[in-house]
Amino acid sequence: MASNGKGPIAPNQFPPPVDPQKEFIKRGLDAEDELIEVGVAIVGGATAGLATANRLLQLLADDPETLEKLGEVPVAIIEKAKSCGAHALSGAVIRPESLHELFPDLSREDWRKERFAFGEVKKEAVYMLPSATAKLKIPTPPNFKNHGNEIISVAALARYQQRLAEEAGAYVLTETAGMQLIVQDGAVVGVRSGDKGRGKENEELRNFEPGSDMKARYTVLAEGCWGHLTGAAIKEFNLGEGKEPQVWELGVKEVWKVPKPLDRLIHTIGPWPLKLSAKYGQIGGTWLYPMKDETTGDDLVSIGFVVDLEYADATTSAHDLLQQFKLHPLVKGILEGGERVAWGAKALPAGGYWSMPKLSMPGAVIVGDAAGMVDTVALKGVHHCVTSGRLAAEAIYNSLKTGAPLSAYEDAIEKSSVGKEMYQVRNTRQPFQKGFIRGAPMVNIAIMTKGKVPGGRLAWHTNDSTPLFIGDTADGYPKPDGKYIFDKLSSVYISGNVTRDDAPNHIRVQKSVPREIAEGWKWMCPAGVYEIPDDAPATGPVEVIVNYTNCVQCGAITAKGGRLTPPEGGDGPLYTIT
């Protein structure tokens, strides 16, 4: 393992220059004539946040007396992207029950007509890939079974949820970043939006618009994975006490228009193109999902690669591993002759049950991915986002009606399918921190026993505490040809990413770091944000160039030694079918 002469080098030895409580917690509200007052402020306009809004408005529609308690603007949704769902990305296959519970009048045919659903899973296959050319079909593991589930786009689902919420009376503020959580007298009392029109040095430009305080009776943190305000709230209210640290994975996805339909859902579980040796610390897998657009008749395929951010080889790159995976005959037979029509990248929480923070605090609750509600064994989280949003809305409504504490939301989660499913896989990912070969037997035991293992609770260590070395994973990455294999910058381009060249830098990292850390950031980032100068020394500290305008806000840097903060509202990708 490479070192600086003083032992192994891990990203957490070079923490980002940020103090979440000092910077992202605002103490007290502005004067009454300088703020916006709403009933419920929801930070994040994607699956979980919009589920909260829609369910709450359903309940209030039949209860004008309670609705009146929330004032002229009963529900406001703050979304940093240009539109709801524009920063949302997932595979995605959803267990349909959660959407049926939220929208009981909608059939699955209705979902497809609204173009956020693309067909029921009727056939599926799981393969092991021993090498770049070989494949071995294996029985579908119980947790992987998807028969009867629905293939969807979370970006498109969010747009549909937004429309329903607005029709029901929600006030949706897009292009608005939630920059600070407002705390007064020990309770969350709202959110402050970010400034617009600042320059590179944070100076006010001609078009400068200051942020404003949004006072709220209740606040819902639905920021998704890595939740900026959620992270500050966890520290402020000690919501992580007695919990394991959160850990992450990074997924990179493409959508292809193909000449012939894929007739089944496919997962692969490696080891190729990852390295099997424990020293590389690589765990990951892939998906290929058929998507039939009933409106246009187009046959589409969602393809993605997910890698655990626990890895040790600094040259591990989820984007390049996806390009390498596409060279396998299994994949080429599906995609060849087609056209890539979309690309995106997003981190996802992988810590599971023991890493979920306390879900409520005075004045606020946390929902969905922001709370870590992802079952990485079943590769599922969207249905948990929907259910948690629904239960949060019901807890807020009951609090309004009866004065019940928001902690009732936590009890509801524990008793729901979310709590039960997350608990059953509570110890199934931690063993992989010892490597695939050593960890797999314990993982299988944990799956078979529904989480029962010696000791009862397996611990995590943070992704950024794993020492990095400069390995040879990158030696296998193919060269881009612009037709089938793509580089990072052309991929960022088709994501619709737009960030002002003179905007302030929203990424916090130490600029001078050992080569191992710099290489790790360079390869990790799917958008090519981190660059090492050509004349940088081969060993020792290097000065990292941060091309922050490339950023698609995937959040992976937070797992590997930096910190993503919200850019100016409206910046970032414009995902449509991811």
Q: What do the PLM-derived regions correspond to, one by one?
A:
Residues R55, L59, G71-S131:
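N-terminal FAD cofactor-binding segment of flavoenzymes
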Residues M1-A41, R55-P74, R198, S491-R515, ...:
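Extreme N-terminal leader/targeting segments of oxidoreductases
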Residues Q58, L67-G71, A155, L164-G333, ...:
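Predominantly flavin-linked oxidoreductase catalytic cores and closely associated redox partners
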Residues G49:
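N-terminal Rossmann-fold NAD(P) dinucleotide-binding loop
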